[in-house]
Structures are given as structure tokens and as C-alpha cells.
Amino acid sequence: MNTTSIKIKLKSFDHRQIDAAAKKIILLARELNIETRGPVPLPTSRAIYTILRSVHINKKSREQFESRTHKRLVILKVLPTNQKLVTEKISRSQLPAGVWIEIEVS
């Protein structure tokens, strides 16, 4: 049968929230009898920001802050007739706060 794949990318600063969101999407897919692959951990991007501790003096005294963006990929194999239903169910599901979701249909 001809199937289309729906790629769902999840991004979050907290790895526990992103894992919970991936679990929720996989459980939703199992309820709808959809073949799933993942969650595939994608590379974590790391941003480091260096600022001066004092405003006008002590150039040697600096402080560093770091933010990590964790990413996961979930792939769903869906029949073309159910594609719209599945994307609506996923976009309307209650995911944890702080999780960004990108849905790509191919």
C-alpha cells in the first residue's frame, strides 16, 4: 500500500518534557493503529553566552550562561486518506509546555 510519512520534530530546553511529549505522540499513534519510528534523538544544540559581571570595570571577571536545545524526531507511516486526521489530532493534543513541534508531511 502507498503510505505517506509524517515527520514530527520536537524541540525543548528540558529533556524530560521532550521525552514526555514524544511518548504522548507515540501513544496517540498506537491508538490510531499507525506505524511509528522513533523517538530518534537528534543532536543537541548548545549556546553559550558570556557577559561581564560588572558593567564598567574588571574585564577579567566574566560569567557564562548556557542553553541547550534538545531535539527528537518521530516518524509516522500513514495512509493518505488518514493524513489530515492524524495531523489534526497531533496538533490538538495537549503537549507539555515548553515543547515546540514541527510537522512535515512527505
UniProtKB/Swiss-Prot annotation:
The keyword Ribosomal protein applies. Gene3D superfamilies: Ribosomal protein S10 domain. Keywords: Ribonucleoprotein, Ribosomal protein. It comes from the Bacteria. PROSITE patterns: RIBOSOMAL_S10. GO terms for cellular component: ribonucleoprotein complex; ribosome. GO terms for biological process: translation. GO terms for molecular function: structural constituent of ribosome; tRNA binding. Pfam families: Ribosomal_S10. NCBIfam families: PRK00596.1, rpsJ_bact. Involved in the binding of tRNA to the ribosomes. Belongs to the universal ribosomal protein uS10 family. Part of the 30S ribosomal subunit. HAMAP family: Ribosomal_uS10. This is Small ribosomal subunit protein uS10. It comes from Mesomycoplasma hyopneumoniae (strain 232). The lineage of its organism: Bacteria, Bacillati, Mycoplasmatota, Mycoplasmoidales, Metamycoplasmataceae.
